[in-house]
A protein has these predicted regions:
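Short, ordered, surface-exposed loop/turn motifs in non-cytosolic proteins
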Residues: 28-51, 68
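Extended active-site neighborhood of metal-dependent phosphoesterases/phosphodiesterases
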Residues: 80-87, 93-97, 173-274, 294-315, ...
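Binuclear metal-dependent phosphoesterase catalytic core
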Residues: 331-404, 408-415, 446-477
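N-terminal active-site segment of His-dependent metallophosphoesterases
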Residues: 29, 81-176, 456
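Aromatic sugar-binding surface patches on proteins
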Residues: 188, 428-451
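Short acidic, glycine-rich surface-loop motifs adjacent to enzyme active sites
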Residues: 269-290
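Hydrophobic beta-strand segments
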Residues: 45-49, 73-74, 410-412
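Short, acidic Ser/Thr/Gly-rich low-complexity loop/linker segments typical of extracellular
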Residues: 51-67, 423, 429-430
Length: 478
């Protein structure tokens, strides 16, 4: 009788059990390569499925183990030495969908080597287009889109990257296709991220779903634009897009980073040298003092701990309320005005900032920005009210300076004579009050300034100097 090797038999039984467990859980192996357009392998490229990470080896190859039911894509973080993949001007080609029915998926990527390194580029940040129906989509197409195209044309000597900060639509999954078409071929590479209105309201978010095969909130977005958490590199900047909405279904959600989101970010940043510039793009803000707990991501401190070693600009939307903050010495948040303003009700946000978007110019380590109001000159940086126009400040000239921060100086002149600094105050913006037909909503902005002219004054001039030394002037006759 042949002697039985119990150790080998036990090992084989355990292995068979593990393989069956892997198959039952939907696990698959993803293999692939990253090569340039000449067929040369690209090493050191970061590859992820949204949870697990690897890098390509010297031959440009990688391997990832994943569960495609839970992580339906594999994607790369494009290195700075290569062009950003796109299709008709919309970011594409950096991700691939997995076949959950296969035990092994092959996902290969092709990148185009830049002819020379990028030192200067333009970054355009667009928040909350939030189109709900054809009427709002038409306003976006006829107001915002031509303005974006005009701005891109004026900056055509630079490479331009665009980022939609979420709420691309307003729960209307059928508008993803026309939205994508609207932002195509604008003279930039246009990326997107998810807002609370970009989930399919019939389902919970992936992390809350026990059976993703039955449907999950991100599904339509994934099919239209790719992953929710991803990154890429351009110039000296590492750009990250993240989801900070935890969706419960049926329009219920919490502004927060899930533990899975933060773990993904920690791993992504592990490939970025400390001290580098990071652009983090999210939907809900992390430090807006006006909306506070009513709109900020709840666990922002955990985020800040990961970001502190870097020079960070956070770009956010969600509030329809413009506010700049410095939540940490190396972290500056731009919670910008919405492209739709106050939900396409008119032409201003709840703080009085006009509908528009932020134009960021990057040169090496230098980052500058200016808000671009839709349909207005790039020099239109504040709104001036005559005495009597601002209901609560009838005797004052009032300036609303939407991109204001603590480095600004705001001076005023009466009949050509310098009178000094205007007085900061907080209140609801009059343009917004007028737009909602006099109904006050309690959203008091901090970027208002006032000055009381003499009774016999003939003119008042306001001079605003921003943190970059740029000067904007407006004069009114009394």
């Amino acid at each position: 009788m042949k002697k039985i090797n119990f150790r080998n038999t036990l090992f084989a039984a355990v292995l068979l059990f593990q393989l069956n467990a892997v198959a039952a859980s939907g696990q698959t192996v993803v293999k692939g390569s990253v090569k340039d357009n000449t067929g040369k392998p690209v090493s050191g490229v970061v590859v992820t499925d949204g949870a697990h990470f690897n890098t390509t080896d010297a031959e440009g190859n990688y391997v990832l183990n994943t569960d495609p039911a839970r992580y339906p894509m594999v994607y790369i973080s494009t290195p700075a030495a290569y062009e950003l993949p796109s299709k008709e001007g919309v970011a594409d080609g950096f991700y691939q969908y997995l076949d959950a029915g296969k035990s092994e998926n092959q996902c290969d990527f092709v990148l185009t080597k830049r002819q020379k390194p990028v030192d200067e580029f333009v970054y355009i940040v667009l928040s909350d287009p939030q189109v709900r129906n054809e009427k709002q989509l038409d306003r976006f197409r006829t107001e915002t889109v031509p303005d974006l195209k005009q701005t891109a044309d004026s900056l055509k000597n630079f490479e331009i990257v665009g980022m939609g900060l979420g709420d691309l639509v307003w729960d209307a999954m059928n508008l993803y296709a026309p939205y994508r078409q609207a932002v195509s071929n604008l003279g930039m590479t246009m990326f997107q991220l998810m807002g609370n209105h970009d989930f399919n309201l019939l389902y919970k978010s992936m992390t809350q779903t026990d059976h993703p095969a039955d449907g999950y909130g991100e599904q339509n977005y994934y099919q239209s634009f790719g992953p929710a958490n991803y990154s890429f590199n351009i110039g000296k900047v590492h750009v990250i897009a993240m989801k900070d909405i935890d969706y419960d279904g049926n329009k219920k959600y919490t502004e927060r980073f899930t533990p899975e989101d933060l773990d993904w970010l920690r791993k992504d940043l592990s490939y970025v040298p400390k001290g580098n510039i990071v652009f983090l793009n999210v939907h809900a803000p992390v430090a807006n003092n006006t909306v506070a707990a009513g709109g900020n991501a709840r666990n922002a401190n955990a985020l800040f701990q990961l970001l502190r070693p870097y020079q960070v600009h956070i770009f956010s939307g969600h509030t329809h309320f413009y506010e700049n903050q410095l939540p940490a010495p190396t972290i500056y948040e731009h919670n910008i005005g919405a492209a739709c303003g106050a939900w396409w009700a008119g032409h201003v946000n709840r703080c009085g900032a006009p509908n528009g978007y932020l134009v960021v110019q990057v040169k090496g380590d230098d980052v500058k920005w200016r808000y671009k109001a839709t349909g207005c000159s790039p020099d239109y940086q504040f709104r001036l009210y005559q005495p009597g126009e601002f209901e609560s400040q009838k005797d004052y000239v009032v300036a609303n300076i939407w991109d204001w921060d603590w480095t600004y100086t705001v001076n005023w002149y009466e009949d050509g004579v310098l009178k000094g600094a205007m007085q900061a105050f907080d209140d609801e913006d009059q343009d917004y009050i007028n737009m909602v037909k006099g109904k006050k909503t309690g959203y008091r902005t901090r970027h208002l300034f006032r000055a009381q002219p003499s009774k016999d004054a003939k003119s008042v001039k306001v001079v605003v100097k921003n943190r970059f030394g740029e000067i904007f002037t407006e004069e009114i006759k009394l």
